[in-house]
């Protein structure tokens, strides 16, 4: 196979990985946890995965403790948890 063919194959595999959604069996367990603001009251806009709605929603994170279902961006939440 030529180097151009290998590059095309690599590009297609990369595109497939990016466009293939996370299945529920591949989803980390912490994606099932409820949003947890934690005890602090700083107030950072954050995102969490809501398994009932099957999407990432915004919530206000207090700035400490909480749980792992807490993302700075919606995109990070979706790439980690969304199906």
Swiss-Prot record:
Molecular functions (GO terms): serine-type endopeptidase inhibitor activity
UniProt keyword Signal present: yes
Keywords noted in UniProt: Disulfide bond, Protease inhibitor, Secreted, Serine protease inhibitor, Signal
Tissue note: Expressed by the venom gland.
Domain BPTI/Kunitz inhibitor: residue ranges: 31-81
UniProt KW Transmembrane helix keyword: no
Main location class: secreted
Subcellular location: Secreted
GO terms for cellular component: extracellular space
Disulphide bridges: 31-81, 40-64, 56-77
Site (described: Reactive bond for trypsin): 41-42
Domain of life assignment: Eukaryota
UniProt-listed PROSITE patterns: BPTI_KUNITZ_1, BPTI_KUNITZ_2
Database matches in InterPro entries: Kunitz_BPTI, Kunitz_BPTI_sf, Prtase_inh_Kunz-CS, TFPI/VKTCI-like
Signal peptide from the UniProt entry: 1-24
Function: Serine protease inhibitor.
Family, as annotated: Belongs to the venom Kunitz-type family.
Listed name of the protein: Kunitz-type serine protease inhibitor microlepidin-2
Native source species: Oxyuranus microlepidotus (Inland taipan)
Organism lineage string: Eukaryota, Metazoa, Chordata, Craniata, Vertebrata
């Amino acid at each position: 196979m030529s180097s151009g063919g290998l590059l095309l194959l690599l590009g297609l595999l990369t595109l497939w990985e990016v466009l293939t959604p996370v299945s529920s069996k591949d989803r980390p367990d912490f994606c099932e946890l409820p949003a947890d603001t934690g005890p602090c009251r700083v107030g950072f806009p954050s995102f969490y995965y809501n398994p009932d709605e099957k999407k990432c929603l915004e919530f206000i994170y207090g700035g400490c403790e909480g749980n792992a279902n807490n993302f700075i961006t919606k995109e990070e939440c979706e790439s980690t948890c969304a199906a």
